[in-house]
Every structure is written in C-alpha cells, then in structure tokens.
Amino acid sequence: MFLGTGEPALDTGDDSLSAVTFDSDVETKAKRKAFHKPPPTSPKSPYLSKPRKVASWRSLRTAGSMPLGGRASLTPQKLWLGTAKPGSLTQALNSPLTWEHAWTGVPGGTPDCLTDTFRVKRPHLRRSASNGHVPGTPVYREKEDMYDEIIELKKSLHVQKSDVDLMRTKLRRLEEENSRKDRQIEQLLDPSRGTDFVRTLAEKRPDASWVINGLKQRILKLEQQCKEKDGTISKLQTDMKTTNLEEMRIAMETYYEEVHRLQTLLASSETTGKKPLGEKKTGAKRQKKMGSALLSLSRSVQELTEENQSLKEDLDRVLSTSPTISKTQGYVEWSKPRLLRRIVELEKKLSVMESSKSHAAEPVRSHPPACLASSSALHRQPRGDRNKDHERLRGAVRDLKEERTALQEQLLQRDLEVKQLLQAKADLEKELECAREGEEERREREEVLREEIQTLTSKLQELQEMKKEEKEDCPEVPHKAQELPAPTPSSRHCEQDWPPDSSEEGLPRPRSPCSDGRRDAAARVLQAQWKVYKHKKKKAVLDEAAVVLQAAFRGHLTRTKLLASKAHGSEPPSVPGLPDQSSPVPRVPSPIAQATGSPVQEEAIVIIQSALRAHLARARHSATGKRTTTAASTRRRSASATHGDASSPPFLAALPDPSPSGPQALAPLPGDDVNSDDSDDIVIAPSLPTKNFPV
C-alpha cells in the first residue's frame, strides 16, 4: 500500500512499474525514428473498445469518487482528455498486465495535427500527473501517469475501506455502550436497589455526567412527588377543619329551623286556644333547653374558630421558619428509599399531631347535647385508627420497658463483674506490693550479708597477713601455743584457776617488734580454752541429770521388786509430794486408752508417776545448797519425761556412761537406795511391766 503520489510510488523500486517505464521509453524512441510512418493499430488498444464502457470510467472519474487532491487539480482540459479517450482505462482496471500493449502507438481516430502536437509535447510533459502541468494547455497523459492515478485511487479506496471498518467498529462499540448504559439506567431506576449501588456506579466512571443527569431527574421527580404529598396532606388538614365547621353550621341551621318551627307551633297553639298548664310548662322547659343548646353551640363555634385561627398562625409560622427551598436542597441528595421513609415518618408525625389535637378538643366537644349523633358518627372511624395506633404504641412502650429492664440487669451484672475485677486488681496490687517489699527486704539482707562477708573477708585477710608476719618474725610462738590448749580431761577444776598470764610465763620475754602478736596469740589461746571449759561444764550438767534419772529408775525398780516379793498385786506405796512439784507428773490416761482399757498403758503410766514422785521425795529430803541447780534440772527432765511417756527410756538408753563425778552427786541419797548405785546398767522403763505383769 503506497502513501504518496505517483512519483514516490515509482521510486519505491517496484519491478512492474520500472519495466513499464522502460518499455515506454523504448517505444518513444522508436516512434521518433519512424516519425513519418503511421503508427500501427494494436488489436488490444483501449481506443478501439466499445463505447458503452466509457460510462464506467466516467463513473470512476467523477468528483465524488475522486480524492480531494484529484478534485482540486481537475480542469476542463483533463475532463476533455478523459472524454476524448473512450474506454482508455477500462481494460487497465480489468487486466493490469496489458499496459505495455495498450499504449504502443497513437490511436488511429486522432487527427494528424493533434498527433503532431502530442508528439512534439510528449517528451516535455511526461508524467504530468506527478510533475504538474500548465493550465489552459492540452496535455497528453501517458500510461505511467494514468497508472499513478489508478494507484492513488486504489489507495484512497483502501483508506476509505479502512475508515469504513473503523467506523463500523466504532458504531458497534457505541451500540454496546448504549446497551450497557440502558441496562445501568434500568438498574438505577429500579427502586429495589439501594443508594450504595447508585453511588458506586457514579464513582466508578470519571465521565459519569449521564449518571448525574439521571439522578438529577430522579431527584426532580421525587421533589415533585414530595410536593404532591405535601399538597395532599395540607388538603386533608383543611378538609378536616372545614368539615368540622360545616358540620357545626349544618347543626346550627337545623337547630334554628327547629326553634323556628317550635315558635310557629307555639304561636299557632296560642291562636287556636288556651292550652292546659302542663303543656305550657313543657313548652317553657323545651324553650329553655333549646336556648341552652344554642348557647353551648355558639360557644363551641367560637372556640373552633379560635382554634382554627391559631392553627393557621402556627402553620404560617412553621412555613416561614422552615422554607421549602432548604428542604428541597436537603432532599436533593437523598435517594428514593430514604425519601419514602421520610414521607412515612412525616405521615406518622401528622397522625400523632392529629390524635393529640383530637384529644385536646374532646372536652370542648363534650358540651353539645346528644343531638350531634351524626357528627360523632363521622369521628368514629379515625378514633378506631387512633385506638390501633395507641395499642401499637403501648406494645412498643411495653417492649421498650422490657428491653430497659433487661439492659438494667445486664448493667448490674457488668457492674458486679467490674467490682469483682477491681477487687481482684486491688488484691493483686497488694500482693505485688508485699512481694516488692519482701524483695526489697531480701535485697537489703543480701546487701547487709554481703557487707558482713566483705568485712569478714577483709578481717580474715588482715588476720592471715598478721599471722604470716608473726610466723616470719617469731616462729617459736605457734609451737608453745599448740602445747598450751591440750589439758587433760580430768582437770576440770584447774581450768577455772587458769591464770591469764600462764601462757606468757613459759615464753621468753617478747621482743619489742612482736609483742602485739604474742598478745593476740595468747588471747586466742584463752578464748579457745574458755570455749572448751564451757562445753565441758554443759556436758557435766547433762551427765548429772542423766545420772539422777537413772538413779530414780533404779530405785523404783528395786522398790517394785521388794513389793512384788512381799505382796503380789498390791499397789506400790506412793509418797505424797507437793502439788506444785508433782502437778505436771500425774496425767489422766487419754480417752482412747480409757476406751480400750489396755492394762499395759495404765501400768506404764503408774510406773513413771511413782518413779518421779519417789525421786522428788528423795530430792526434798537430800536437798542441799550445792545441788539446787541439779534438782531444778531434774524437775525439768522429769516434766519432759512425763510428757514423753514411753519415749523417755530410749533417751536414757542413748545417754553415755556416767562420769566419775556421778557417785559424788548421788552421795546424799538415803540408805535404802544404796544398792541403786552399784550397777551401771541402763533400764528401759516400758519393758518392766511386761516382765513383772505378763498379760
């Protein structure tokens, strides 16, 4: 497809065009050589074709079918040349391969002068369609120029076809778009769809002016509907008021006619004759009743007119304060369902207002007599509607009350939960504070202990350094210090008379540089010996207590043996003791022992009590100033032995053998217990009753 004129088309390198041009040049040269000879007529010449084919070429060469460039350059000379050559291009359109045969010579029907003129001007005006021509002069067009024109026409035809295809596609797309928009308009006009759908459709397309226009039209329609509804509402209001006034007027007219009739009847009765007194009285009563009825009706009419006037003033004031323009401007952005809901709400409010007005006007209307039955019958229908509304409102109020109670219960439950959570929170906070305080105390203790450890470690280091210095300065001091703290275990009383300077007497006189070290070593030796002495003293006290207990049990055993040998089954004699001393010793058997009645436990208790009582009696008789502390310790041990019951004999079995000082402690005992000190055997108390009193 070529996009230029005839010359660029020839320059593109088309083989067919170049071949045609070469043939035409060769033919022109041959014609110039054979100038005097007439050109031979070709059997396939387009000039010898039928004249009926000219119409088809003329139809191609018309101004409407040619491109704009061809129309601008169309001149009468070209038209004359086109008409002078009938059928010149019909075969070119039908068979493009016959171009080299179609223009081999000048047609035979042409005059000689024209042929000479064409031959003279032919080399100068070649490719006139591409190079241009001088207007007003006849131009002979060669087949190359005609070929260029045909190519241009084909190009224009192809362009027009492509334009037609493009327009068809555009038309199809526009039809699809129109159908889609029609569907969208139908969806928008559908009242079942919501406002969100309309807004999303309006927001999806940036060029949604048609949607906006449609919405505006809908808004206008809805505004008109709202105006119509307002008009109907106002008409209903005015009709209601006028009907009430009309009814009152009709009632007044009827009453007036009735009064007039009664007056005429009264006058006729007076003219006809005298009536009895009863009839006169009834007529007077009727007149009074009618007068009172007229007065009440006039009052009610006056009240109704005043009410009508006040309602008109209220309506004017409402209309002045709330203009319809602002309402319509507010309603413009509303959707159809929302407007319908608003209309329903307004109708409900209007019905409520009418019901309230009717309730307010009921006491006023109660004054007329019962002859207004027709007017009351007219108001019965809205009262039924009002009753329905009241029932519905009562049901709604009942539901709201139930919901309120349920919500109050839920609120109370939530309050309780909140209180519980707050209490738990307070408890947790207290626990957290306690934990923090404990943590702080623990940290303080740790810090104190760390400080003590640091001080002790520092002291230990100092002592170690001092010891090293002492060892370096005077190595003889440690050897004598080791010899001193090795006393014999039998020298108990000599430890009390240990001279404080005995460690220093055996040592040589200290030299001046190590005198402090010697003093420290002596102090350490004294401290060690004092600790050993205290330990031994405590051990001696415990040994004495153990010896006393052993002696008591031995004496008891000997007594039991003697008594058993004398009289089997008699109770052992019990020495009466002080109540304060023996108060912890006698214990009543437990309820379990009494319930079971086992004689073994009773015998064990009796044995322990008797042994301790005997020991206390002996201690009272043999009490001296030297053994007061020993007696107190034995009382404490006896009290602990009574609480332990059967656990005391294992304690006695675990005690070590008495020291050599044991016989000295038992020396003041009476003569009947002399045999108790001869044996060193440890007696277990619970085993005695089993041997003496087998069950």
UniProtKB/Swiss-Prot annotation:
Residues 465-482 have a biased composition (Basic and acidic residues). PROSITE patterns: IQ (PS50096). Disulfide bonds: none annotated. InterPro entries: CellDiv_DevSignal_Domain (IPR052318), IQ_motif_EF-hand-BS (IPR000048). GO terms for biological process: limb morphogenesis. It is found in: Cell projection, Cilium membrane. The modification Phosphoserine is found at S322. Component of the EvC complex that positively regulates ciliary Hedgehog (Hh) signaling. Required for proper limb morphogenesis. It is linked to Polydactyly, postaxial, A7: A form of postaxial polydactyly, a condition characterized by the occurrence of supernumerary digits in the upper and/or lower extremities. In postaxial polydactyly type A, the extra digit is well-formed and articulates with the fifth or a sixth metacarpal/metatarsal. PAPA7 is an autosomal recessive condition characterized by postaxial polydactyly restricted to the feet. This is IQ domain-containing protein E.
